[in-house]
């Protein structure tokens, strides 16, 4: 994955737990990289090893780390570096989710070697939809939950996410039931 992913994990850890913990996590993961370059590709293993080591060093489950990382990705990483792209993708949570299927094709204009996830929306109703997530990468279901929670916070829209189907349990791909209520008045 592009270095910006590993950089974002570093940012999350350093902001919340300090630079010493980040050094300990890199050492435990056996990752010998001083500075991750956003535009450079790194093996996916580096990212998985960092999450595994963070779980051990911080005494948190990998699930909680991936959820926190998903929220951080939306609320800090994406907002700071790519705010206009986020804004262009929708003015409300449901609008943003309906446009999610084409979102990473715009990201791929900046990151040409991107291997993006694929999303689609079905059963779209007032306040509810099924969001389908396809990826060749295993183990990122909780990252998606965190991303969706982050989007809810970004739009000030209370959101509930329930996992309806899991690839890790034999389904074709992960499916989330996403329910939202009216955005809080600004
Ligand atoms: C401007 C905002 C965003 C940027 C710049 C961005 C960029 C990226 C990049 C660079 C990767 C790594 C993939 C690779 O290197 O091959 C990635 C992965 C991913 N992105 Fe985004 N992304 C953004 C927003 C989002 C949003 C809003 C969602 C969903 C709600 C999302 C879902 C994912 C997922 C699930 C992955 C993990 C890869 C996988 O599942 O295979 N991203 N994204």
Go through the PLM ranges and name each one.
Residues 1-33:
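Charged, compositionally biased N-terminal leader segments and the immediate start
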Residues 21-22, 26-59:
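Long amphipathic alpha-helical segments
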Residues 4-5, 114-132, 137, 141, ...:
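Short terminal or interdomain "cap/linker" segment that borders an active site or interface and mediates
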Residues 10, 14, 101, 145-152:
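Generic solvent-exposed, charged/amphipathic alpha-helical segments
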Residues 47-141, 165:
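Amphipathic interaction/junction segments at domain boundaries or subunit interfaces
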